[in-house]
């Protein structure tokens, strides 16, 4: 096993350990578990965002992934505020409305990122590419102002301010679901096409596995909530969606679908050409085996 693969295994084990700690905190209801779980997930996503900043070559792709990471941090933090710090029904309701900002924009950014998978740094950008953000911005604006029109959620008469749980869904809510579902389907279809290895029938399955797990989780979510031990371990929809998004695009990076500034060690391990890379002081940091 190469040093690069061994390092990746150590990193994956560390990430799995952090997630396991967070899951155990939720399962055993440790004091302040919501706060500490959010801290752990924030550290994971922030660390991934820092790695994206250093690894991703294409500026537009890097900005999309960093924007998605910022939205995930926002989602986790407003959820913590809603459950641990919010005091009034109005504050609870408005924080709940704010969930729809990342819920709508993260799938949109995933779709937007696909525009750049086939394009180099100097390739001309699509002229109307930003139009893709108009519809989700309109939708989450309608959700945030729902108290004025109740086009997303309708509350019983006289209980609009109190935020009664006996609400009904209206057509803006279903438009939000339709947009999220459409972005997810288009992303999966595009990734399946891009994951097909040229001139073969083989497919790179790694980027598709997190999407499949996220879809399976969404389908089983109501069943999970009805089983106490499953709800305790895996009842956190926000965390699951954030982690599967991160895993999907990290898989795209590892498979080479997203260009990255990595893989030099592997290249030098298998290269038959003489070569080396030095640091700024001209001290060799990578040598090809034949050079040694």
Task: Enumerate the language-model features and the residues they cover.
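Extracellular-loop-to-transmembrane junctions of the mid-late helices
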Residues: 8-13, 27-41, 143-187
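Sensory modules in modular signal-transduction proteins
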Residues: 252-287
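Individual alpha-helical transmembrane segments in multi-pass integral membrane proteins
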Residues: 31-46, 56-145, 174-177, 237
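Interfacial "cap-and-anchor" motif at the non-cytosolic start of specific transmembrane alpha-helices
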Residues: 2-10, 21-31, 189-263
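Juxtamembrane "helix-exit" motif on the non-cytosolic side of transmembrane helices
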Residues: 21-30, 78-89, 143-157, 217-229
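Alpha-helical transmembrane segments of multi-pass integral membrane proteins
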Residues: 54-76, 97, 129-133, 167-222
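Alpha-helical transmembrane segments
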Residues: 7-22, 67-74, 134-137, 210-212
């Amino acid at each position: 096993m190469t040093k690069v693969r061994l390092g990746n295994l150590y990193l994956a084990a560390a990430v799995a350990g952090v997630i396991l700690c967070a899951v155990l905190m939720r399962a055993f209801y440790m004091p302040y578990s919501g706060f500490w779980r959010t801290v752990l997930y924030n550290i994971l996503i922030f660390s991934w965002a820092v790695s994206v900043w250093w690894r991703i070559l294409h500026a537009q792709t890097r900005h999309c992934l960093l924007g998605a990471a910022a939205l995930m941090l926002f989602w986790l933090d407003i959820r913590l505020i809603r459950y641990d710090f919010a005091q009034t029904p109005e504050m609870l309701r408005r924080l709940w409305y704010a969930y729809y900002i990342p819920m709508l924009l993260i799938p949109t950014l995933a779709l937007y990122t696909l525009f750049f998978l086939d394009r180099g740094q100097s390739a001309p950008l699509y002229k109307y590419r930003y139009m893709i953000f108009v519809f989700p911005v309109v939708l989450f604006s309608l959700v945030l102002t729902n108290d004025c029109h109740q086009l997303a959620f309708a509350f019983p008469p006289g209980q609009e301010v109190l935020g009664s749980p006996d609400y009904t869904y209206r057509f803006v809510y279903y438009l939000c679901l339709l947009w999220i579902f459409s972005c997810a389907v288009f992303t999966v279809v595009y990734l399946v096409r891009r994951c097909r290895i040229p001139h073969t029938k083989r497919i790179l399955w790694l980027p598709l596995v997190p999407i499949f797990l996220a879809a399976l989780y969404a389908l089983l979510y109501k069943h999970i909530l009805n089983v106490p031990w499953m709800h305790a371990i895996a009842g956190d929809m926000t965390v699951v969606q954030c982690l599967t998004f991160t895993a999907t695009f990290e898989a795209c990076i590892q498979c080479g679908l997203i260009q990255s500034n990595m893989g030099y060690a592997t290249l030098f391990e298998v290269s038959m050409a003489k070569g080396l890379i030095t640091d700024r002081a001209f001290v060799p940091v990578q040598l090809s085996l034949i050079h040694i």
